[in-house]
């Protein structure tokens, strides 16, 4: 049985050719100019179509190099939320030496006003955070805080260095990576009193009701949360690591600081002084003795301050010390502890 034939039905041409109306060449010599979005006859130059879509694959950027082969992307880099302006500036190619010089000159001429100061501050914040091994999230938070201050023209009359120091200190507390005022002072070369004044002013602005509390953040998710003061337990890990003390000493020193806080043995003393004196006592008790001078070099607390705080701990040693902390369980506590 033969299958039905469809030869009698009309057919349509599914292949449509675009031929130049002037030269009528077949096959046509068509050129797609993606840079202008036009379809042009390669023989006579007649434009046959416009607004064509570039279907070629787009390049992705894996390099920050300024060389000609460094960034093949044609759409530019992503906008930086920490900078002002639209950041849609025209740039000059740096293909050769002359182009590189022109690119630098053009970049300086079109730079958004005030952006240079922000970039300088961000560079300093990044370098300072790297110097004391702070994670990137702390540096980003400090930069965001600095931008909020700059946008609202807050803290007028204060030096940029003192503002940077205060921003890093607040960022450390927000990120649960505490650093002392003395460490920030040594890092930034800003007097401790100046950092303290700027920090208190900035903290008031960031808390509820302050000038910066309801401002729109440059980085979403970085809301300011007022934190409590740094405790001695928070400082133990870093100080003990720098003194090459084992984990057992860290845990015992942190517990000693907690007990001293509950009993009020060192009431009124700074957390760093409590941490230093606790390390001095526990390191000797557990067989890893450190001198006040060694502890002073790490913590920044003077020898005399460590000895005075230790004297108060020594007076209540029986209530504060757990017998299992003694290196030689059968040993005498008083024989192992240094005399106050």
From Swiss-Prot:
InterPro entries: Cyclin-like_dom (IPR013763), Cyclin-like_sf (IPR036915), TFIIB (IPR000812), TFIIB_CS (IPR023486), TFIIB_cyclin (IPR013150), Znf_TFIIB (IPR013137). Sequence repeats lie at residues 128-204, 239-315. One of its GO terms (molecular function) is RNA polymerase II general transcription initiation factor activity. Keywords: Metal-binding, Nucleus, Repeat, Transcription, Transcription regulation, Zinc, Zinc-finger. Pfam families: TFIIB, Zn_Ribbon_TF. It comes from the Eukaryota. One of its GO terms (biological process) is DNA-templated transcription initiation. PANTHER family: TRANSCRIPTION INITIATION FACTOR IIB, TRANSCRIPTION INITIATION FACTOR IIB-RELATED. This is Transcription initiation factor IIB. It comes from Schizosaccharomyces pombe (strain 972 / ATCC 24843). The lineage of its organism: Eukaryota, Fungi, Dikarya, Ascomycota, Taphrinomycotina. The gene is sua7.
């Amino acid at each position: 049985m033969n299958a039905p034939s469809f030869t009698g039905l009309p057919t349509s041409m599914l292949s449509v050719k675009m031929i130049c109306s002037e030269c009528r060449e077949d096959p046509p010599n068509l050129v797609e100019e993606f840079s202008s979005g036009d379809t042009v006859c390669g023989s006579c130059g007649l434009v046959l179509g416009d607004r064509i879509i570039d279907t070629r694959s787009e390049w992705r950027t894996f390099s920050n190099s300024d060389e000609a082969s460094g960034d093949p992307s044609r759409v530019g880099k992503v906008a930086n939320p920490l900078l002002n302006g639209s950041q849609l500036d025209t740039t000059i190619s740096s293909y050769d030496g002359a182009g590189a010089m022109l690119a630098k000159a053009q970049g300086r001429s079109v730079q958004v006003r005030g952006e240079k100061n922000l970039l300088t501050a961000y560079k300093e914040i990044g370098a300072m955070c790297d110097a004391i091994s702070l994670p990137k999230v702390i540096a980003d938070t400090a930069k965001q805080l600095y931008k909020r201050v700059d946008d609202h023209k807050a803290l007028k009359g204060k030096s940029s260095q003192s503002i940077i120091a205060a921003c890093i200190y607040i960022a450390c507390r927000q990120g649960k990576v505490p650093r002392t005022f003395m460490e920030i002072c040594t890092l930034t070369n800003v007097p401790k009193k100046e950092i303290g004044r700027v920090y208190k002013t900035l903290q008031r602005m960031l808390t509820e009701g302050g000038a910066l509390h309801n401002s729109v953040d440059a980085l979403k998710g970085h809301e300011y949360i007022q934190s409590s003061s740094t405790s001695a337990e928070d400082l133990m890990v870093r100080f003990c690591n720098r003194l090459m003390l084992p984990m057992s000493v860290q845990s015992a020193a942190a517990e000693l600081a907690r007990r001293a806080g509950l009993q009020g043995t060192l009431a009124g003393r700074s957390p760093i002084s409590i941490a230093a004196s606790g390390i001095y006592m526990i390191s000797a008790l557990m067989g890893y003795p450190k001198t006040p001078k060694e502890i002073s070099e790490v913590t920044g607390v003077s020898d005399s301050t460590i000895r005075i705080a230790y004297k108060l701990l020594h007076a209540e040693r029986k209530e504060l010390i757990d017998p299992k902390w003694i290196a030689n369980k059968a040993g005498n506590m008083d024989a192992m502890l240094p005399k106050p």
